[in-house]
């Protein structure tokens, strides 16, 4: 319809505006229409009917222009709400502009007043107008207000659309404690027949990956593809980044190539994410190979990429290359940011160049970058690691005078170091300082001090500190949250009580540092070390009443504690009573080790067979065949069969083999132990230094010196440095044998090249040998 024809049809209802009397030209049309809209806003009440005839002539630019020029913010909000009902008039510019207006003084209050006026006047509102309000609250860090706005949509007879759900989900996924609530909202979205889109799944998967919940993220991806939604470039990048975060760089690389073949060409974010994944694992050869391939495709290495590579080189202890790469980066006029400075300071600290790290830290302000808490913490940790506790403490005090105020991590580093050096009282003083400064101690801070108190034998004080953590959080709320699961939040969201659910979670998050399973494990370990196994078992019951679940460390600690006090039967009862933890290899290894110490090698062997069957690595027939071989004394055949299965499944674990080897030594079955050693060496499976020590000592005692020398040479070939005691025993045994005197000379040359202090060892053994010979002659 031509403009002139349209206005003839509506002219009877409205007086002719001045701009319509002029000729219609594209050059000044938008300006004229904007002026007419502002005139209507100033003169007409209500504005909505007067604006309707202008709809065909309005554009996104005009909407933004009017909102920007309107002096009365409330009228600007009302105009935005009216215009946003039409999707073609929505734009990022107007959306962002209104967010800025809401962020100003009383902006949100004026917006709510506008919404209330519209409701009173019977004017309907669209969910889009709530999206902008929720986004504004989120931008200002007022998440509770954002949730409240979402919850109040029903008051305005306004149903959220997928865009609104995406906005509120993004707010909730930022905090781990609100995960349950986010998924309750997602479930409500599905119940309301509001179909999630690609961005919904992207928000949920990104949040899940960032919190380490990779299996849930994978389920979400499967749900997305099951709905016929294909991933786009952003989704692929989220998946690649998530896989890299959990250490699955190879899977991420496959997905990267799949992304390329699907037509979603990776951008710099995806390239950097994959590069960072390999760097985090220290696989620098592959990282640089990837970089070469990327550069062939036109990728240009920037600050993010350089930071990942430098960090990876530091992790791989390739310090020289890391600094060379940093120098190359500077030559390309790429300036480091706070993240790279932190990486460099950490790298220098790990390389033992603490003075250089301090210089870099002090030079940052002159480069226009203020050191943050992470930078200071890296240096403080390095100083404390070298035992320079006073210097670390001084830097913490210096830090207090800057904008980078010490955080819970700073105090935890100092407390750990103090406790490690036996300075528990000083650690307690630092802990007191935290509370006085208004900085809340984290769970890790509490755990560090509890551990220090336990190791110094102050179990009563450690228990009181745990109680102090518990007092900070209402148990009833904790139990309600830990036992109810998502169901209670689903109900609250469905009934419109989303704000109450949010406040419950926020209260839970803000009421102090609740003891976690690590807190209890530290204390249980303290009681076990002190021989108070009954006190440790009571703590097991307490933590379960608090809604916590014991983990493999809990059971491993208790099983070890029970064995130490000779309560073997109870240890096995505890083991068999908890099916969940029969899957943990650590618990199995612990029981196997204790069984071997009591010379029950067959029991240890059968335990591992049960573990393999439990995790479906072994079928019953094969397991029975291997067990029968071991029972009948065919140890080598059983061992080779197991190694063959482990290698085939790519699940080779060193633990059971070394436990059996040491167990055979402890049982005096050195012939079989030597056979295990030979098979492991043949299969290129590393035999641990403790296993070698047991073998050498036992073989020397049985005068099997050739075999003992063979094992010792193996340790030299693998750069193991054994303690002087076993080396002295070997040399002493060789010197007592007249046939082995020549070998002593050859062996000491090898030892000297390996860094052993041969002179002192040899002098000691030769002196001992001569004294022995002298005594023999006297006796004769």
UniProtKB/Swiss-Prot annotation:
Ribosomal protein in keyword set: no
> Which regions does the record annotate with the repeat PPR?
91-125, 126-160, 161-196, 197-231, 232-266, 267-301, 302-336, 337-371, 372-406, 407-441, 442-476, 481-515, 516-550, 551-585, 653-687, 688-722, 723-758
Q: Which UniProt keywords apply?
A: Repeat
- InterPro entries to which the protein is assigned, alphabetical: Pentatricopeptide_rpt, PPR_P_subfamily, TPR-like_helical_dom_sf
Q: Has keyword Repeat?
A: yes
Tell me which Pfam families the record gives: PPR (PF01535), PPR_1 (PF12854), PPR_2 (PF13041), PPR_3 (PF13812)
Q: Please indicate which superkingdom the organism of origin belongs to.
A: Eukaryota
Which one of the record's GO molecular function terms can you name?
Answer: mRNA binding
The UniProt similarity line reads: Belongs to the PPR family. P subfamily.
Under the heading PANTHER family, the entry gives: MITOCHONDRIAL GROUP I INTRON SPLICING FACTOR CCM1, PENTACOTRIPEPTIDE-REPEAT REGION OF PRORP DOMAIN-CONTAINING PROTEIN
Tell me what this protein is called: Pentatricopeptide repeat-containing protein At1g79540
Can you name the source organism?
Answer: Arabidopsis thaliana (Mouse-ear cress)
